[in-house]
């Protein structure tokens, strides 16, 4: 992957460094829909008229996320990515499992984040496969600024939702970021203290994303065919959140 980190430079056409602000270059999002998020404790909006963007056309390597923190504030941000380990949750039409596809997305995110200066990222993926409790314990073993859990949903519904105990700003950021990819059913940001992961994570900001419903044909196909796009978009959301809250 070609990645260039620039300190104190002005790059024509792609990157603008203003004062001590964060420099970042992120993939362009064409034809972004307007997104209005809500914070709720129950499901909302049953519109099933989903419209999805095309399958991945460019690799993650061709869509760089370049970041240069300000020189005078080199705060290292610690992130933990925890994809689903649910190997028995099968996608529509035997297209794989929730664990398989969420780990794929998390691994791409990990590869994108690990080379960014002043970001330290851990990921419970292929080479670990920790249980849920083990992953939360590993996340809690050091101070984390961000804990992000990746899941797909089931049960006959449709659309996107995210759960959090008290990190509403972070959860809303990741929710809105994913919704830029298509006209998905907006199920909302759910404040809840009964999920083990969101309730027991000690990170400053914790959210559990349910991207789409994997038992629905169109949504399962979208997740399977657009993992690089999803990963890159979620990295974009993370970087923007870090920029807004830490750098």
Model-derived regions: residue spans:
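Active-site-adjacent mobile loop/cap segments within catalytic or ligand-binding domains
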Residues: 80-82, 147-149, 190-247
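Sec-dependent N-terminal signal peptides of Gram-positive bacterial secreted proteins and lipoproteins
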Residues: 2-24
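Surface-exposed patches in mature extracellular/periplasmic domains of secreted proteins
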Residues: 118-126, 184-192, 245-247
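Active-site-adjacent substrate-binding region
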Residues: 166-190
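Non-membrane alpha-helical structural segments and their capping/turn regions in soluble enzymes
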Residues: 99, 103, 168, 172, ...
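Catalytic-core regions of hydrolytic enzymes
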Residues: 61-170
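N-terminal, intrinsically disordered, polar/charged segments of Gram-positive cell-envelope systems
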Residues: 23-78
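Sec-exported extracytoplasmic/periplasmic mature domains
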Residues: 107-118, 140-144, 152, 175-183, ...
């Amino acid at each position: 992957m070609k990645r260039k980190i620039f300190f104190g430079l002005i790059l024509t056409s792609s990157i603008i460094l203003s004062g001590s602000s964060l420099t970042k270059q992120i993939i362009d999002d064409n034809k972004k829909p307007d997104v209005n998020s809500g914070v709720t404790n129950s499901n909302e909006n049953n519109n099933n008229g989903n419209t999805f963007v095309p399958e991945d056309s460019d690799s993650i390597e061709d869509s760089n996320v370049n970041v240069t923190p300000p020189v005078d504030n080199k705060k290292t941000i610690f992130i933990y990515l925890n994809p689903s380990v649910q190997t028995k949750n099968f996608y529509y039409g035997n297209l794989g499992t929730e664990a398989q596809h969420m780990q794929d997305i998390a691994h791409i995110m990990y590869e994108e984040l690990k080379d960014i200066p002043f970001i330290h990222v851990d990921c419970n993926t292929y080479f670990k496969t920790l249980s849920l409790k083990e992953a939360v314990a590993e996340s809690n073993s050091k101070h984390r600024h961000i804990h992000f859990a990746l899941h797909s949903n089931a049960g006959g519904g449709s659309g996107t939702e995210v759960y959090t105990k008290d990190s509403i700003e972070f959860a809303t950021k990741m929710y809105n970021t994913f919704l830029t990819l298509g006209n998905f059913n907006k199920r909302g940001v759910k404040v809840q203290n009964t999920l083990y992961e969101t309730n027991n994570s000690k990170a400053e900001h914790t959210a559990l994303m349910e991207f789409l419903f994997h038992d629905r044909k169109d949504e399962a196909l979208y997740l399977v065919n657009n993992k690089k796009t999803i990963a890159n978009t979620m990295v974009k959301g993370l970087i923007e959140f870090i920029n807004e809250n830490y750098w």
